[in-house]
Amino acid sequence: MLPCSLFLPKHISTSLVFLRSARHGFALLPRWVPRLSSDYPPAAPIRLLAAAASSRRPADGAGAPSRVRQNFHPDSEAAINRQINLELYASYVYLSMAYYFSRDDVALHNFARYFLRLSREEAEHAEKLMRLQNQRGGLICLQDIKKPDQNDWKSGLNAMECALLLEKNVNQSLLELHTLASDKGDPHLCDFLETHYLNEQVKSIKELGDHVNNLVKMGAPESGLAEYLFDKHTLGNENNHN
């Protein structure tokens, strides 16, 4: 039979007590007493888990090397993260425009719907790039999103002109990303940009350019009636089709 001391927990000790017996007199029996040793209590479980995890984590905190990464240059990975930030910034600007035009003292609700649609499209563009980053084995590094340059968009014409400039900036960034991908010999990234972004950007620039031109012809921004009619008929029809 194994001695009971083998089954004692590390931090529990025993003491002896006297038990009086009518037949046998006094006897020594072990009594279980939770008398704790000097190294009790042990480290908290959460701290132990964190220490174990940190011992396995690389120094840069980036996680284990990707098993799916192939022909994906670090410069392309960084440029995609910058493009994600730009797409989110564009979405932020269009969201500001949308809720400016839905104010009670502006009340151009088709302008509001138009820019809200653009905001959602830009957010989808950012998410699509995030999915690409994961598919290629890159690391998504989100950055601070810059606030819009203005909160008062003044007129429909001013907002359309700002949107046109913004779309050109986004397009230029995409073109530079495409050039980088080509220089690094990454046909998949080139095809991805051509399929999902470049053609759509050209269409958006043309659409916004047409809107600016038509508003100017109608007498905006001096004529408030021009923006009202443009909101009601031109953008109203577009929103119905979309």
Curated annotation (Swiss-Prot):
InterPro entries assigned: Ferritin, Ferritin-like, Ferritin-like_diiron, Ferritin-like_SF, Ferritin_CS, Ferritin_DPS_dom
Q: What is this protein called?
A: Ferritin, mitochondrial
In short, the EC number is: 1.16.3.1
EC top class, in one word?
oxidoreductase
Q: What does this protein do?
A: Catalyzes the oxidation of ferrous iron(II) to ferric iron(III) and stores iron in a soluble, non-toxic, readily available form. Important for iron homeostasis. Iron is taken up in the ferrous form and deposited as ferric hydroxides after oxidation.
Q: Where, by residue number, does Fe cation 2 bind?
A: E122, E167, Q201
Gene3D superfamilies according to UniProt: 1.20.1260.10
Residues forming the Ferritin-like diiron domain are 70-219
As its record notes, the protein acts as a catalyst of: 4 Fe(2+) + O2 + 4 H(+) = 4 Fe(3+) + 2 H2O
SUPFAM superfamilies on file = Ferritin-like
Q: Which organism is it from?
A: Bos taurus
Annotated compartments? Mitochondrion
Residues involved in Fe cation 1 binding: E87, E122, H125
UniProt keywords (A-Z) are: Iron, Iron storage, Metal-binding, Mitochondrion, Oxidoreductase, Transit peptide
Superkingdom of this entry's organism?
A: Eukaryota
Query: Which family does the UniProt entry place this protein in?
Result: Belongs to the ferritin family.
